[in-house]
Amino acid sequence: MAKTSAVEKNNRRRKMADRYANKRAALKAIVMDQGKPMEERFKAQLQLAALPRNSSKTRIRNRCEVTGRPRAFYRKLKMSRIALRELGSQGLIPGLVKSSW
């Protein structure tokens, strides 16, 4: 199990990223628009830099929904390989069958 504080920190980052997503996208669009004057683009860049660091999506870490483990994460299932193996062997994941040949 991961530390509860690490999982909570990641959850706070997710909420903050959702809260600032529209504002961040609008500022990035202004910064990338070559048709805008340089002063306006620079001002938008400064506003973007003034936003909280944790409002960026790149600060979010993919973590297992079951254990909170940050590594060996399957995006499609939102869980780690260890949790996948345990739940799969218990038959709790539909369609997952232990292979044998």
UniProtKB/Swiss-Prot annotation:
Record GO terms (molecular function): rRNA binding; structural constituent of ribosome
Signal sequence bounds: none
Pfam families hit by this protein: Ribosomal_S14 (PF00253)
Keywords assigned by UniProt, alphabetized: Ribonucleoprotein, Ribosomal protein, RNA-binding, rRNA-binding
InterPro entries named in the record: Ribosomal_uS14, Ribosomal_uS14_bac/plastid, Ribosomal_uS14_CS
One Gene Ontology CC term in the entry: cytoplasm
GO BP field: translation
Superkingdom, natural source: Bacteria
Record family assignment: Belongs to the universal ribosomal protein uS14 family.
Subunit note: Part of the 30S ribosomal subunit. Contacts proteins S3 and S10.
PANTHER family, sorted: 30S RIBOSOMAL PROTEIN S14, SMALL RIBOSOMAL SUBUNIT PROTEIN US14M
Task of the protein: Binds 16S rRNA, required for the assembly of 30S particles and may also be responsible for determining the conformation of the 16S rRNA at the A site.
Protein name as it appears in the record: Small ribosomal subunit protein uS14
Organism ancestry: Bacteria, Pseudomonadati, Pseudomonadota, Alphaproteobacteria, Hyphomicrobiales
Gene: rpsN
